């Protein structure tokens, strides 16, 4: 159905969902009047040009020796990233409560959480940040991992964290957050730009948040943050791809699992096993939330020859990696893990640099998949 909307109208018509925003570009002459436009459809010419650019930048692949290095030393590249940027790279993701109201279960009318001023901040947020050293992009996250201990302790090495987790007894009645009635796990938490807004928004003492990251440096930054409260949050180092590493909570114990620009950072052939394991952690009725890069996003089109690892999988200049998904690929990953689709949508956004008169087309995919009631395995 062909729908056009005046700028600023609600996106209730034609089945458009409001969470992705309601600023629509009906007059191309006004493109530089705002920093971003929502639900922007591509022309056939744009789609063909995007496909051509991807074919072009995929012709020259990274050699196998370097590919092995990026995989074996993936934690080193992410640790270097956080040592350089610390907690100054990403902004706190307050927009998540509009997209994923499941993250604030005690609040009502979450769709109205953002005022117009807050929504302006969201648009500005999407324009900021670096996707590695080469691109101006919103998000950048990795294969998940982090560390144990409280903020009064000296920084923990990854080895000591792993050892503590190995000796932690995980049973039905005794584990971190066992007394909570609502449990959230963020995989790939970085320096806490999702975790801390969740804790600040939810004052319910029965809510507990786990967060993990592949980078011990990132987890250390979470644990030493003044907002980190070990009575409400448990941060730990974890490699999402390592099937021998256990989680600090039992199966069927989590209400929500969050994957924000994380799954795209791991090797494609390891994604399914990672989702399978996470699915087993969900309670029956629990939900997995994902937001990640979509096929032909601006970031993919800007990669140069020699940065392609495999089809739609690239390495950035800093050694971190990124994959660009289709909706069908993500649907297959989640349904194969035994989850049921609640939402699988493409967010097409036109970002504008008014100073340089540049337009940048972003493509993100947002998913919600639920574990069926009555299911006790992933």
UniProtKB/Swiss-Prot annotation:
UniProt GO molecular function: tRNA (cytidine) methyltransferase activity; tRNA (cytidine-3-)-methyltransferase activity
Domain of life: Eukaryota
Record keyword S-adenosyl-L-methionine present: yes
EC number: 2.1.1.-
Catalytic activity: cytidine(32) in tRNA(Thr) + S-adenosyl-L-methionine = N(3)-methylcytidine(32) in tRNA(Thr) + S-adenosyl-L-homocysteine + H(+); cytidine(32) in tRNA(Arg)(CCU) + S-adenosyl-L-methionine = N(3)-methylcytidine(32) in tRNA(Arg)(CCU) + S-adenosyl-L-homocysteine + H(+)
Protein localization: Cytoplasm
GO BP terms in the entry: tRNA methylation
A Gene Ontology cellular-component term: cytoplasm
InterPro entries, per database record: Methyltransf_12, METTL2/6/8-like, SAM-dependent_MTases_sf
Similarity comment: family membership: Belongs to the methyltransferase superfamily. METL family.
Complex and partners: Monomer. Interacts with DALRD3.
Function per UniProt: S-adenosyl-L-methionine-dependent methyltransferase that mediates N(3)-methylcytidine modification of residue 32 of the tRNA anticodon loop of tRNA(Thr)(UGU) and tRNA(Arg)(CCU). N(3)-methylcytidine methylation by METTL2 requires the N6-threonylcarbamoylation of tRNA (t6A37) by the EKC/KEOPS complex as prerequisite.
Full protein name: tRNA N(3)-cytidine methyltransferase METTL2
